[in-house]
């Protein structure tokens, strides 16, 4: 009879991956990164454990969306005060805080539980091509999606 094995926390091998978001489609990049963060690319994936890897996303300001989403997609946040709803388009948020767009897309694809919050801490998003994690020697993660040409 076969037994299901559950990996112990010290047996999980965590790696660092680097993703270049330049000319990548937002949703396609987010699904690949969320899968790596979750650990679904590993043979010892366990749904209730954090078996994923660290992911560094660079060039967040150069991410693309298809269609008219750059003008029509809205990002909402609320201060918690009456009348405190702030609405911003993709284009405006991309010029102001491009990291937030990528973070929000990936966070929405992770579990909405304590595990998802723990997984989200392993995501590092940066504007530009520089990042402070060179000591971890991240591997380049090539995405299956093709780049958007315009």
UniProtKB/Swiss-Prot annotation:
GO terms for cellular component: cytosolic large ribosomal subunit. Gene3D superfamilies: Ribosomal protein L13. Keywords: Ribonucleoprotein, Ribosomal protein. One of its GO terms (biological process) is negative regulation of translation. InterPro entries: Ribosomal_uL13, Ribosomal_uL13_bac-type, Ribosomal_uL13_CS, Ribosomal_uL13_sf. SUPFAM superfamilies: Ribosomal protein L13 (SSF52161). Residues 128-150 are annotated as: Disordered. GO terms for molecular function: mRNA binding; structural constituent of ribosome. This protein is one of the early assembly proteins of the 50S ribosomal subunit, although it is not seen to bind rRNA by itself. It is important during the early stages of 50S assembly. Belongs to the universal ribosomal protein uL13 family. Part of the 50S ribosomal subunit. This is Large ribosomal subunit protein uL13. It comes from Prochlorococcus marinus (strain NATL2A).
């Amino acid at each position: 009879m076969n037994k299901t094995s559950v990996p112990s926390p010290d047996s999980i091998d965590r790696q660092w991956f680097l993703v270049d978001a330049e000319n990548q489609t937002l949703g396609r990049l987010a699904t690949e990164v969320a899968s790596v963060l979750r650990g679904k690319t590993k043979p010892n994936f366990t749904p209730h454990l954090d078996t994923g890897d660290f992911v560094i996303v660079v060039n967040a300001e150069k991410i693309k969306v298809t269609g008219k989403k750059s003008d029509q997609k809205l990002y909402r946040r609320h201060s918690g005060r009456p009348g405190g709803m702030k609405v911003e388009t993709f284009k405006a948020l991309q010029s102001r805080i491009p990291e937030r767009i990528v973070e929000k897309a990936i966070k929405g694809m992770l579990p909405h539980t304590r595990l998802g919050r723990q997984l989200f801490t392993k995501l590092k998003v940066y504007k530009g091509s520089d990042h402070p994690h060179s000591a971890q020697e991240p591997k380049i993660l090539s995405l299956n999606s093709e780049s958007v040409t315009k």
